[in-house]
Amino acid sequence: MLTENEWNTINNMLLELYTIDELDVFTSKIMKMIRMLIPYTKGWFIILDDDRKIRKEQSYFIGFDNDVKDRYTDVFYSEDYIQYLYDFISETSVYRDTSILESDVREKTDFYIKFLKPEDIIFGCGIILIKNSRIIGMFNLFRNEKSGDFNEKELYVLNLLKNHIANMLHNVMRLDRASITVNKSLNNFAKTYGLTSRESEILSLINKGLSNQEISDKVVISVSTVKKHIYNI
């Protein structure tokens, strides 16, 4: 079903994605890379909390302005018929919007009439990402009426990628939570001991495992100055 070039694209994409350990980089990168395999006009990568609410600051949207992002996250997410699937699936699953509801039913929903149709994104597909029996995210691609619906080959590609994406997202989210905890500890340490902004910056880089030379290159100061800051810390 796939050409050799398409298989190579998938392999190279996964190899690159597995090296990413920052959540915002991961979500933006995958949304951009997937276009090489599945053309789309707009899309989003939604991150969900334990209550299936959108973690707005950590979610990534492409092709939408801020007003539309806010309308979806604040109003239309609760009306999105994708939630019909939430209670019926137990593992990471690929879906196509036109397969969730019959067209005559779908086109009468508020979500279709007030959001999808005005934004000209009437065709959609994606992945509901589940790890340890919990929905952790939702990956959605959209097309306008002119571009047409997503086909079986494109859904096949998503099925090939789905478990990789779920595993990568789970790992990156775990690292993100750990990073937030560490940053809070570093900030508290800096406040307690009255570190300067430069000393705080160097402390953060040390925590990331950078050598004195790497810190010197990054903040554009000499290695000897780096050592002086470390001594003060």
Region spans (language model):
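Recognition helix of helix-turn-helix DNA-binding domains
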Residues: 210-233
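Regulatory loop-to-helix N-cap segments in sensory/regulatory domains
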Residues: 2, 143-158
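Glycine-rich acetyl-CoA-binding "A-motif" of GNAT/NAT acetyltransferases
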Residues: 135
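Regulatory input/activation interfaces that engage signals or partners
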Residues: 13-21, 29-132, 141-144
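Pre-recognition alpha-helix immediately N-terminal to the DNA-recognition helix
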Residues: 12, 200-205
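Regulatory hinge/linker segments at domain boundaries
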Residues: 176-201
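Signal-transmission/dimerization alpha-helices at domain junctions
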Residues: 157-176
